[in-house]
Regions:
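Short linear Ser/Thr-Pro motifs
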Residues: 73, 107-108, 121, 191, ...
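A short loop-to-beta-strand scaffold at the N-terminal edge of the catalytic core in hydrolase folds
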Residues: 90-95
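Glutamine-centric residue-chemistry signal
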Residues: 29, 109, 135-138, 309
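Conserved alpha-helical substructure of the radical SAM core
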Residues: 122-152
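Canonical Radical SAM [4Fe-4S] cluster-binding loop centered on the CxxxCxxC motif
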Residues: 97-134
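Conserved AdoMet/S-adenosylmethionine-binding subsite of the radical SAM
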Residues: 143-152, 157-317, 322
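Auxiliary Fe-S-binding modules of radical SAM enzymes
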Residues: 1-89, 243-251, 259-344
Length: 344
């Protein structure tokens, strides 16, 4: 049976290669062709002997993801790709171009089951989990377009990473592998809706990644409206899990807070949020919502955003307001895929 050779560690590749009678060092050569040179044709892997290349054609699967669409913002700061996988599934990935290097935002599932009211990816529910190789392929798709260093990885595209736990962990270990991209795990951020037992499990993995939790509200009433899946875990329990993660890993947790006019962006909401987290060492990433024609939700005024931020900082909380990158190219989760499908 043919084996898909994309998305495997060097030890896994060595085991497969040697089990079929080839020298162990050929695995490293093959891995270099795949991940350092991004070559998908066995015929072009000329360091491998001819008989091995012919054997690979018969016994290995190597399918290159297809970029179906890509668009870059007017200011050049954001590029979004729509990538077609081998089974025809479409996933989005975004590259944010910073002065210190590129930050790649990847999807971990096709579709999403979380039901966030502001997200287009969840409209049709969850289709399937992505494999570690399929997540990795999104990162490498940008290698075709940009010859620039990748500084950081953000698991913040379509899907809930912690419900695809094993493949997401495999991806993190692959992308941080010195033989692949060698991204420091400290430059990897995993964003979750707050699945409490999985946060505790992640804390035990010994991977000091940054944890970002989609909080989006100061209480359960508002949070359940914005994020229906949050009904499974009380907001106080989510915050407590974040605190345990910090104590176990030493990594400060980021709370993502999307600001929606007349929903969760008032002075009272800010004060309640401060009471919720108490003296916890954390960071707030404030995100004025991306308004679209498909949802009747709008960002607060810039003045109200600053007031919200100032209240948090008055209580000693570290905050940032996310740069509005990619608005005009529909860079919010799921929007490029939706537009592509509407045109078909």
């Amino acid at each position: 049976m043919a084996w898909n050779i994309w998305g495997h560690s060097l030890p896994e590749m060595e085991t497969w290669i040697t089990s079929h009678g080839f020298p162990k060092f050929r695995a490293k050569q093959l891995q270099d062709y795949l991940y350092r040179r991004y070559i998908f044709s066995f015929d072009e892997m000329t360091l491998l002997p001819g008989p091995m290349r012919e054997w690979l054609k018969e016994n290995a699967i190597l399918e290159k993801p297809v970029i179906m669409s890509h668009i870059t913002s007017n200011d050049g700061d954001t590029t979004k790709l729509l990538v077609k996988l081998s089974d025809g599934s479409l996933v989005e990935t975004v590259c944010m171009h910073h002065v210190y290097g590129n930050s790649i935002c990847v999807s971990t599932q096709v579709g999403c089951a979380m039901g966030c009211i502001f997200c287009a990816s969840t409209r049709n529910g969850l289709e399937r989990n992505l494999t570690a190789g399929e997540i990795l392929a999104q990162v490498y798709a940008f290698r075709e377009l940009f010859d620039a260093p990748i500084h950081s990885i953000v698991l913040m595209g379509a899907g809930e990473p912690l419900t695809n736990y094993e493949e997401v962990l495999r991806f993190i270990r692959l992308v941080s592998d010195p033989g692949l991209l060698n991204i420091s795990v400290r430059n990897i951020t995993l964003s979750t809706c707050g699945i409490v037992p999985m946060i505790d499990r992640l804390a035990e993995e010994g991977l000091p990644i940054t944890l970002a939790i989609s909080l989006h509200a100061p209480n359960d009433t508002i949070r359940n409206r914005i994020l229906p899946s949050s009904r499974h875990f009380k907001i106080e329990d989510v915050v407590a899990a974040a605190h345990r993660y910090f104590k176990k890993t030493g990594r400060r947790v980021t709370f993502e807070y999307i600001l929606i006019k007349d929903v969760n962006a008032s002075r009272e909401n800010a004060e309640e949020l401060c009471r919720l987290v108490g003296k916890m060492n954390c960071h707030f990433n404030l995100i004025p919502i991306n308004g679209t024609e498909h949802i009747q939700l709008f960002p607060p005024s810039w003045k109200d955003v600053k007031i919200f931020q100032e209240i948090l900082e008055k209580h000693g909380k570290s905050t940032t307001v996310r740069r509005q990158m990619g608005d005009e190219i529909q860079a919010a989760c799921g929007q490029l895929k939706r537009r592509y499908l509407e045109k078909k």
